[in-house]
Amino acid sequence: MATWDTRQGMNISSASVPADTDEFPLSGLTPAASSFVKPPRVKESPAAFECRHWKTVPLPDVVPGTEKGHFVVIGHVVGVYIDDRYIDDGMVNTGAMQPIARMGYMEYSVVKPETVFSINRPTVNADGTVADLDPSEWDGVYR
């Protein structure tokens, strides 16, 4: 997971480099052994998913005829690492991790404790219309 603290290394690792380039020294981030897959995770990251390749889906050319080779890679999660410092009462404290998200263009956003919120999911009746929408904060019940 890319976080506020790892943003510079994450950005450096987005550079186009030859396929055999080890991006860890380039990024300044530290490799850590994974439990179920060969590739290492990023030690500085508070969370990581270990995945096995399932499918690579080619995307159409943005500009027809340019054949840039854009793909979506899909994997099965076979292992999860979460730093214990971010577990509160059995739940992940996402805000404390301060993950970042790619928005668009060169823009990113950061999740902070003061921007995280929880709300109840609505229940829906058999014909698919919303039967109950409780706008209050999440009550701890999964629906």
Regions found by a protein language model. Name each.
Residues M1-R143:
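Basic, polyanion-binding surface patches
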